């Protein structure tokens, strides 16, 4: 007997999609990493430019940047790029590395989808072929300072009596300092940050006062200072280049003055006559003037002029005569 035809029944088992969670690591050198301070973008590499590409941006948390799960329901190879979005902090060196995430989706013997993930790093601060750690560096500022000196001829130097300015290349006064009693002119630290790598020029000058001290000659030297800021890795270094002459020299010339010595000669038992006695004026043992008495007994030496500050010691003595009746 002929059996009636039976329609075959086909059963389809729907494959479950396989999921992958993209994740990279974040490290910061120089200070403590704060959650949410750095941003990362994942973007699908789509060979068909006309199709929209998947994108997502997240921030770091607990030292990682974790993106949303990606679902795959088809066997194939899928590529994504992960990069850090450079921030605006000028004192941070941001890692420009690009990480390519390759997802290979296959079907196992049971017909289930499975995925393998491979990360490769390129550019930036890449340390290995499979690097997926984004390393940022906080670049600490560098400080440097320098001194000049002050010398004064003609009298003793006083603390704080002369002023000096430090100017930048535009002529703007950055600092004003005075000398110590020992003649040191010390300027404060100059600080340079990550944006100031390069050459910086300055000028140091003595301030010439409007009301100049009488007898003072001021040094008009304009001393040029060059500071070169370089970067080795992520560390700043400052090198100072000072001129050969770093001493400001002033000269004090006091107004000329005079001194004149007058003495009196007395003679007992006899009338004093003019020019009867001779007197010598000595300095440092050397006779510098010789005078005789007047009839009234006065002895007057010539005026002595002084052009410099100092101490002078003199001796006046009577030159012995030949009259044996006079002691």
Question: Regions from the language model: what does each represent?
Answer:
Residues 1-327:
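Solvent-exposed loop/turn and edge beta-strand elements of beta-rich ligand-binding domains
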């Amino acid at each position: 007997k002929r059996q009636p035809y039976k329609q075959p029944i086909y059963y389809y088992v729907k494959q479950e999609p396989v999921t992958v969670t993209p994740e990279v690591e974040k490290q910061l050198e120089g200070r403590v990493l704060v959650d949410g301070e750095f941003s990362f973008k994942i973007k699908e590499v789509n060979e068909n430019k006309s199709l929209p590409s998947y994108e997502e941006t997240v921030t770091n948390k607990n030292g990682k940047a974790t993106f949303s799960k990606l679902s795959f329901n088809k066997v194939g190879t899928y590529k994504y790029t992960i990069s850090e979005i450079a921030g605006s902090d000028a004192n941070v060196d941001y890692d420009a590395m690009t990480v390519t995430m390759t997802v290979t989706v296959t079907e196992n013997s049971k017909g289930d989808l499975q995925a393998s993930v491979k990360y490769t790093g390129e550019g930036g601060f890449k340390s290995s072929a499979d690097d997926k750690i984004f390393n940022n560096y906080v670049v600490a500022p560098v400080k440097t300072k320098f001194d000049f000196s002050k010398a004064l001829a003609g009298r003793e130097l006083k603390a704080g009596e002369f002023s000096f300015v430090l100017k930048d290349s535009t002529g703007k006064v950055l600092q004003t300092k005075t000398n110590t009693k020992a003649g040191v002119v010390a300027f404060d630290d100059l600080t340079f940050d990550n944006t100031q790598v390069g050459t910086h020029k300055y000028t140091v000058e003595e301030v010439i006062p409007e009301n100049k001290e009488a007898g003072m000659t001021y040094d008009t030297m304009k001393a040029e200072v060059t500071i070169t800021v370089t970067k080795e890795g992520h560390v700043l270094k400052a090198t100072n280049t000072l001129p050969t002459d770093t001493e400001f020299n002033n000269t004090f010339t006091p107004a000329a003055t005079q001194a004149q010595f007058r003495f009196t000669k007395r003679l007992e038992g006899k009338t004093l006559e003019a020019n009867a006695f001779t007197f010598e004026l000595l300095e440092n043992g050397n006779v510098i003037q010789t005078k005789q008495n007047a009839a009234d007994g006065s002895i007057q030496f010539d005026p002595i002029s002084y052009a410099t500050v100092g101490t002078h010691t003199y001796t006046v003595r009577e030159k012995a005569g030949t009259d044996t009746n006079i002691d």
